[in-house]
Amino acid sequence: AGELVARCIVETGTSSYYAALGEATSEPVLKEICRRIAADELRHYKLFYDHMKRYLVADGLGFWRRLWVALGRIAESEDDELAFAYHAANDDNARPYDRRRAARAYARRAYALYRRHHVERAVAMLFKAVGLKPQGRLSRLTVRLAWWSVRHRSGRLARAAA
């Protein structure tokens, strides 16, 4: 069940990213591709969530363990994979890979795409996966904190790049 919680978190991230990217572009083909990918990621989330519910009791995976798995997976999203992918796709091949620089460049572009409703949906999906009320008071507080964090980090990265 723990791996299914982690998969729900991955699908939360990818669906919110493609929804944000699709809404940010004016290019109709890219907009449609992103819409379809985001919808597909939501279907994956539902599949993993439904299976996770089946295994929770058998695996003895309570709230705290689910929360730990989810937070661990969120932390892993800051790992080398996205930074290196950004470097490979955007940097001059002669330029050596610098994880910190590539991670910041990727985050600067990605965070700028997000709007509050993307954060609201991501928090609701996260809360649902760990067993919290997706529309409760704690969720609303988390949305405010997460949205502030996205805006703050986006602004800081943009200023640093200027």
Feature-to-residue mapping (PLM):
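Non-heme di-metal
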Residues: 1-162
